[in-house]
């Protein structure tokens, strides 16, 4: 069997035999969710995570003939201080792995050339107000982090939607 399901209370987890199967399974579930949301709304907003753990999922998702022109794509997190063309930038990862491949209605990167981190945060909060997130495609890190929300800075009642954080390994990010 390639996929095993386990359930604990309301949580359903699917364990896949390979990363390829996992990516395809997640993409199918994502495509179904996207189609359902687009039955309810004219346009939707999707927040994408950037990490090698997303490779198989992003590749499989592109195979679906979805109305991408009704979807606004948003970028979850970014390092501070990298050049615009730096391969380590998560925006560049997303551009390479999905954003450039599909005709999204719009793409919103968490980066403004020459802007201060604080101005980038303010701008992206405005983007999120205009495009409130309908669905997020992400993973959960080994230490429990989601994006750059490491456990020591993840405050669910935080008044800021976007902020600069200092990671446990001392690198600044937004």
Which stretches of residues belong to each language-model region?
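Short, surface-exposed, charged loop/turn segments at secondary-structure junctions
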Residues: 143-165
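Short glycine-rich anion-binding loops that position phosphate/pyrophosphate groups of nucleotides
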Residues: 52-53, 79, 140-145, 151
